[in-house]
């Protein structure tokens, strides 16, 4: 009997312990799966310190971060709230500096370093990733010679010395700010390839294109794939130029070269040409190569189909109601809106026609004056004139000098 009593007590004790253990398990807080995973992946943690990575005696990177840890497999280290960072290429030269980011990941084995513009799980918020990047002028102490990068993500590959920058990327140089979806930088060539919704903001206007190449040593930017340049600056006439290709520089006082199906519009004037040069310093736009210019009356507006008709050489409808000027070249002032055409100048308007060496257009008076070997057509004959004045709004041709009498058409 006594043995049975002890057995009952023993079994009851075991049962009680099992129940208590189960209750403790069910009631005790448990770490979420991602925290358990995070704990198991950490080998070493550090807080508020400077950390660096080296390989074969050379420095790869150096960061000041609020905190971070090294993975147990030692393949990568994660850094949180990077206050400043430096990245070096395989030759030991500084490539990226002044880097700040919510977090970064470095992999010593692959020599790949990544920085991110938003904390994990907070995509879509404004990026806090910013850095100065080597694009040819990094040796200068003048910070204006450095290129500033703002983006959602930067990946730098030290072995191949290139960077991939993506997500609402910005490349800032002096007074210019270039926006793109993606920027690929070859640090060996000091060259950046840009793609996706390119927009360049400068003090003198706005430029858009599909693709572009930036050459850091010469600070030259080549844009292609539907280039549109809107020249807008205080004290100038709004001028829009479209072309297939454009070449420009970080120094906005240097000229912008445009080529391939150039189309320029300024107020009542629309021109098509093979090539163009825009000069901010000279306050002018120069077009050359088979230029065709339509000049409307003050109350009229340039319609989109007008450019298409000029491009297709379908000028019959234009000749009925507009003033058409063809020449070897034409130059527009971006301040007054006046224009000067030169070389094989021909002006037609409602059946009237005149030709000369040069023509000057006064935008305010809507007056076109032709000079130099001037000829005006009267019937089937061409009459030599000293000058022909064309009143665009009144649709009148007036010839004078070296003719039998002054006359109007």
Task: Please place each PLM-identified region on the residue numbering.
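Mature-chain termini and adjacent capping regions
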Residues: 1-409
